[in-house]
């Protein structure tokens, strides 16, 4: 049967502003979202046996309808009206519940792959519409570019001028619930109205916009996040920030040599998940 293997990249947030709580329980956000080359691997195979099947083998990642990748494939099957089966094998390299968007990226990759395998011809815009019904970050991964994300994350504007930075990703091997972080967030007032530039020429420009309104919530419960930020800066990072709802922290570096040296230094003195990666631009 026809099969396709694709990479599903993680993301970091160079910026995450929580603007206000919405009547529907979600929050209006303003984010700068950047894909990185830490990737899960997704193999999608068409099958004679109807229905969707997901296998992963990673603790904490469900295989059935609770898996967002399963729901992505099922949504496109329902749209297509076809009776074919879809088998999805996920090799997880992105830490789970880490603020890196691994599940959302898997779902977006399944949308793109199933659309291609079944020859549905759905546009990126239509796939993004399907994606937002699955999760707020899914449209960004379908979009496939560095972006300013607004609304709940589904209103996307491409940021084309981004330097090819290197990052060191550090995860303390603690899962954090995104729902808990947002429930614990204490909004102090309306957004102050500052603007975000759309052009970044170097690492200093990116460091100038680093901010995450969720960081104080997560760091209060998991102080190790603050320790990781300090370790990254001490290892030479131009800036460091928690990604998404955490607990993963990233440090920004201007060169591969600096990033790999810092990653090795932190790996040698901790039992954390540490990796040097490129920003995908």
From Swiss-Prot:
Pathway it works in: Isoprenoid biosynthesis; isopentenyl diphosphate biosynthesis via DXP pathway; isopentenyl diphosphate from 1-deoxy-D-xylulose 5-phosphate: step 3/6
One Pfam assignment: GHMP_kinases_C
Residue ranges of coiled coil: none
Active site: residue positions: 11, 137
Catalytic activity: 4-CDP-2-C-methyl-D-erythritol + ATP = 4-CDP-2-C-methyl-D-erythritol 2-phosphate + ADP + H(+)
GO biological process, one term: terpenoid biosynthetic process
Entry GO MF terms: 4-(cytidine 5'-diphospho)-2-C-methyl-D-erythritol kinase activity; ATP binding
Keywords: ATP-binding, Isoprene biosynthesis, Kinase, Nucleotide-binding, Transferase
Alphabetical list of InterPro entries matching this protein: GHMP_kinase_C_dom, GHMP_kinase_C_sf, GHMP_kinase_N_dom, IspE, Ribosomal_Su5_D2-typ_SF, Ribsml_uS5_D2-typ_fold_subgr
This enzyme's EC code(s): 2.7.1.148
Binding site for ATP: 95-105
Protein's job: Catalyzes the phosphorylation of the position 2 hydroxy group of 4-diphosphocytidyl-2C-methyl-D-erythritol.
Similarity-based family: Belongs to the GHMP kinase family. IspE subfamily.
Protein name per the record: 4-diphosphocytidyl-2-C-methyl-D-erythritol kinase
Gene coding for it: ispE
């Amino acid at each position: 049967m026809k099969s396709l293997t694709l990479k599903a990249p993680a993301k970091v947030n160079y910026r995450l502003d929580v603007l206000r709580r919405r009547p529907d329980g979600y929050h209006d956000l303003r984010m700068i979202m950047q894909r990185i080359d830490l990737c899960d691997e997704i193999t999608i195979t068409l099958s004679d046996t109807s229905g969707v099947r997901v296998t992963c083998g990673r603790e904490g990642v469900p295989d059935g309808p609770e898996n967002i990748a399963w729901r992505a494939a099922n949504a496109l099957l329902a749209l297509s009206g076809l009776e074919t089966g879809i088998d999805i094998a996920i090799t997880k390299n992105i830490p789970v519940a880490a603020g890196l968007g691994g599940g959302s990226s898997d779902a977006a990759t399944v949308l793109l792959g199933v659309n291609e395998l079944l020859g549905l011809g759905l546009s990126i815009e239509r796939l993004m519409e399907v994606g937002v019904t699955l999760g707020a970050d899914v449209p960004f991964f379908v979009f496939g570019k560095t972006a300013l994300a607004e609304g709940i994350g589904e209103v996307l504007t491409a940021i084309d001028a981004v330097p090819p930075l290197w990052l060191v990703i550090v995860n303390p091997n603690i899962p954090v619930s995104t729902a808990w972080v947002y429930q614990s967030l204490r909004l102090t007032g309306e957004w102050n109205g500052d603007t975000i530039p759309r052009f970044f020429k170097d690492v200093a420009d990116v460091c100038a916009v680093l901010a995450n309104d969720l960081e104080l919530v997560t760091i209060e419960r998991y102080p190790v996040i603050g320790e990781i930020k300090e370790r990254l800066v001490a290892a030479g990072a131009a800036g460091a920030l928690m990604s998404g709802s955490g607990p993963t922290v990233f440090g920004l570096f201007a060169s591969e040599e600096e990033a790999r040296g810092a990653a090795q230094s932190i790996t040698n003195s901790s039992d954390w998940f540490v990796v040097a990666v490129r920003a995908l631009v």
